[in-house]
Amino acid sequence: FQAEDGIRDLVRSRGLGDVYKRQIVNSFNSTKILKFVIRYLSIINHRTLITLLLSLIVPFCAYNFEIIYNIDLTLISIAIIFPLVFAIRGAFKRREKALEFLSLHRGAIKTISYFFMNSSKLPDDAKNEIKEILNDLSDSFLNHLSQSNCNTDKIDKKTELIYKFIEKHNEELSGGVKQKIFRFIRDVHVSQENLIAIHTHRTPISLKAYCLIFIYMFPVIYTPTIINKIGLENPVGLTYFVIILSEFILISLYNIQDQMEYPFDKDGLDDIKLDYFKNAYKKV
């Protein structure tokens, strides 16, 4: 809304006609709507296409070959729903933990910076140096989380620079200040190690594979039972609708879980906005 008000102020200040004003504002609104739609369609991918094809092919074969039976679907429902719900809950907890440790990481780095800035014996050049070290560590670590690389050697070396800086300016920092700084360096290490663990280790692959296989198998088992319940005398389109809708719901939940499981890659709707956790310090 603030951006829209800015557009309106801009066209008003430049003396454009009412028609041009409306065109610019409408174009801006259309762009917002388009981006909104694209974001919410991000859960549709190749797996959605596979399930759609299965939902069309299986009923076609069932009707043509008259494959109809009536079985209890409780077991197959448990086989899909239980691992799917378990995986979604696990992905949600991972995301919440990631937010918790990102906040801890940012807070610890900012607090460390405050201790250095309040050290009266520390020269301005040294204060600027430690600011650059902390900025570089924050940016590098968050960039590392957004990538698939699991090697943390560079991050470890950048974190170690804080300790080397303390050693270098040992006489200019009081013992009490150093103890407090080390306390928050520990928080930096704890948050980094936990975030690296979240970044590296995912939901058990075997569980996800098991869940996906049964989602693909679901139309094969489910379709003849639906035909039996609906009846051959009822419209064929009703069977297709039920199968397609059921498969779309299941695969969409699976895709949401898959996106939520990678909270740092900026690919899903619920991905964490890492830029909000960066530290930007001005030089003294």
Regions found by a protein language model. Give the residues of each.
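Bilayer-spanning, highly hydrophobic alpha-helical transmembrane segments
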Residues: 209-229, 237-253
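Hydrophobic alpha-helical bundle architecture
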Residues: 200-205, 225-233
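Single conserved hydrophobic/aromatic residue that forms the stacking wall/gate
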Residues: 1-23
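N-terminal juxtamembrane/topogenic regions of multi-pass membrane proteins
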Residues: 22-103, 230-236, 253-254, 258, ...
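Structured inter-helical modules in multipass membrane proteins
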Residues: 112-207
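Juxtamembrane/interface alpha-helical elements of multi-pass membrane proteins
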Residues: 83-133
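Soluble C-terminal extramembrane regulatory/interaction domains of multi-pass membrane proteins
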Residues: 182-185, 233, 243, 259
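Membrane-interface, cytosolic juxtamembrane amphipathic helix immediately N-terminal to a transmembrane helix
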Residues: 26-46, 176, 183-213, 265
